[in-house]
Structure formats: structure tokens, C-alpha cells
């Protein structure tokens, strides 16, 4: 290449580090999975290139700027860290922290949402970040919302001719007809059948049914 490893290091040393806010946790059934993913991300982000701001979201939706050890994420001990500072993402202000009665804006170049499931992968966080004018990693609002709902995603694929596996569904309002719908699905798909919630993450609530 043009530069030796040492030369590249010198180039990075004089460039401004990118400020990355990493969101983890979330008000979701996949809160624990997010904490594990964020642990991996935080352990592997190159701190010579990036200034990292971990932002944890509790299961009940409280946001905190977190400065404690990364290893406390998986256990959930991060929530009890004495240095946690209440935070939020606000349209017009970006990422803000509330400390000692003062609201201060934190400069952020990009947000990395390491969130899983509802309120993380379904377009909600993405919409908030767009309203706040913050660039972010991952799919946009529409792609996130469509792909989070497996029924909508399958219907979009059907309408556009994208190949996919055979499927069937039951809407919430059809619950009284569960037995009839299950028989229809068995006739259409054959056994075994994999059953899962339409709008949860890929690993949540899935089961393998071999008979009625």
C-alpha cells in the first residue's frame, strides 16, 4: 500500500476521532441479547479511531450514559453503576445528558444501535434518530419496520416476486379460529411446522410443532 503500518498510525493520530454512540439494552424481550451483542461491539471498536459513548436503555425505557466496565453489561450490573448519567435523544439537540440539573448536548458523529427486537429493530429508534438529525448504522425506518413484521415482509416478497419459503399466518383477531387455522397450515405446509411471533426477533418465541 501507499503507507506502512506505522505511517497509517501517524495519519490516524492527527485525524479527528469519530464519536460513536452505542445504544444497548432496550425496552424489549430481547434486552439481554442486546447486552451480549453490545459487549462484543464495545470490545472490538478501535479506540484509536473512535471515541465511544455507550448509552444503555433499561427494560422500562430509562436511558443512561454509561462509563463503567464493559464486562458489567452481560450481567445487567451496568444499571447499578454509580456513574450513570440520565440521557436522551432529542430532535434539535441530538444526544443530551442531564447532570446536576444541567442539560448538555453531547457531540456525536454516528449512532450504532445495537438493539434487538421491538423498539430497536422495528423503525422506532431509526425514526427518532432521523428526527434528531443523527446519522446511524443499519437499515432505515421503512426497511426496519417491514422486516420486523414477518407477515408484512412475506406479503411484500409475494407482491414483488421474491422467492421465499412456504408460510401461513394467524392474525390476532383470528384467535377464536386457532384450531381451524392450525389444520389449514398443516395441510398446506406439512409437518413439522416452525411457529413464531410475527413481530419479534428471530430467536424469540420460536418452537417446532410435529402435530396438533
What are these regions (language model features)?
Residues 182-194:
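Acidic/histidine-enriched active-site and ligand-binding environments that engage anionic O-linkages
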Residues 34, 165-169, 192-212:
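Glycine-rich phosphate-binding loop of ATP-grasp-fold ATP-dependent ligases
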Residues 16, 48-50, 163, 191, ...:
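Residue-level signal for beta-strand positions within conserved beta-sheet cores that form or flank
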Residues 2-142, 146-152, 156-159, 171-183:
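ATP-binding N-terminal substructure of ATP-dependent carboxylate-amine bond-forming enzymes
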Amino acid at each position: 500500500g501507499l503507507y506502512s503500518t506505522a505511517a497509517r498510525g501517524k495519519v490516524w493520530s492527527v485525524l479527528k476521532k469519530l464519536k460513536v454512540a452505542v445504544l444497548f439494552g432496550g425496552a424489549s424481550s430481547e434486552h439481554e441479547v442486546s447486552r451480549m451483542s453490545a459487549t462484543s461491539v464495545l470490545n472490538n471498536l478501535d479506540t484509536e479511531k473512535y471515541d465511544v459513548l455507550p448509552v444503555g436503555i433499561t427494560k422500562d425505557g430509562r436511558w443512561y450514559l454509561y462509563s463503567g466496565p464493559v464486562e458489567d453489561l452481560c450481567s445487567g450490573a451496568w444499571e447499578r453503576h454509580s456513574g450513570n448519567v440520565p440521557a436522551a435523544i432529542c430532535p434539535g439537540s441530538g444526544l443530551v445528558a442531564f447532570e446536576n440539573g444541567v442539560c448538555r448536548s453531547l457531540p456525536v458523529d454516528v449512532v450504532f444501535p445495537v438493539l434487538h427486537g421491538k423498539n430497536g429493530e422495528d423503525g422506532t429508534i431509526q425514526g427518532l434518530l432521523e428526527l434528531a438529525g443523527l446519522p446511524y448504522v443499519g437499515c432505515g425506518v421503512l426497511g426496519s419496520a417491514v422486516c420486523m413484521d414477518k407477515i408484512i415482509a412475506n406479503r411484500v416478497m409475494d407482491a414483488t416476486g421474491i422467492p421465499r419459503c412456504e408460510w401461513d399466518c394467524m392474525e390476532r383477531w383470528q384467535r377464536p379460529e386457532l384450531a381451524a387455522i392450525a389444520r389449514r397450515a398443516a395441510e398446506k405446509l406439512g409437518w413439522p411446522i416452525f411457529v413464531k411471533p410475527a413481530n419479534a426477533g428471530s430467536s424469540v418465541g420460536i418452537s417446532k410443532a410435529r402435530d396438533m
